[in-house]
């Protein structure tokens, strides 16, 4: 399990990269300062799922439903965060209307498993249909995804207990926040009371090691890092998916978690580089659980699944 305590972790080095637990079933974890949980009060338990890539093949719908039921039974989360790429793919040039409709209908059916839970989603790069008949078509682009995911906007925020949550849209030029969104984020962080613990979620990693292996990270990472440094009393953790790899990185007292993929190797068995069945490289299919404490500390643990 990964725990972050403000201003106490690796002050000299500044950066630590997670290591794989030898069992292969635990979190990809770093070695933080030990804390007595008896002195901390848990504010929220949050499930983070990402890169579901739901579709008809590989019996994926039933497997996904079983995993969601497992999460509910085992962890009893307060709510769910969905990191994007919810459907198999709508972005390829050869995708047609019926395929998009079918994928979203499967998503709708699966997500009824969580009908008693709030699900806060962000948009992934495979969710939007760019080859709709025209830009005026109701299913073109991000607006349709916003509608299907039942979210208020392509980027938005909300608060729970004493924590604030910011959901970003990195689906812009070179994987970045557009200027309108960045200015909104600046104001959003500025208006928060001092020391408000804040979690941010983007589909794409902002910082971490997975980008070194497979790319796919925010091109505006330095700009965002500087903004987070300005609000270092608030920004505690940044979640992502996209790369289907599990990685925890600490930098400047912020915990960056790329939390693998529910679909692993897109619900398939894998390839020559897969470390095990269903793995993408060394990461098995899975999901993450976060413990968010009243004092602003964070624990993020990645749980492989075998569904």
Task: Describe the predicted segments one by one.
Residues 301-307:
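Short, solvent-exposed aromatic-acidic interface loops
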Residues 30-101, 153:
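N-terminal active-site segment of His-dependent metallophosphoesterases
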Residues 51, 84-85, 124-125, 203, ...:
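Active-site glycine-centered loops adjacent to acidic/histidine catalytic or metal-binding residues
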Residues 192-209:
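Short acidic, glycine-rich surface-loop motifs adjacent to enzyme active sites
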Residues 1-20:
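N-terminal secretory signal peptides and thylakoid transit peptides that target proteins
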Residues 46-48, 81-82, 121, 200, ...:
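Residue-level marker for buried hydrophobic side chains located in beta-strands
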Residues 92-197, 219-235, 245, 249-301:
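Extended active-site neighborhood of metal-dependent phosphoesterases/phosphodiesterases
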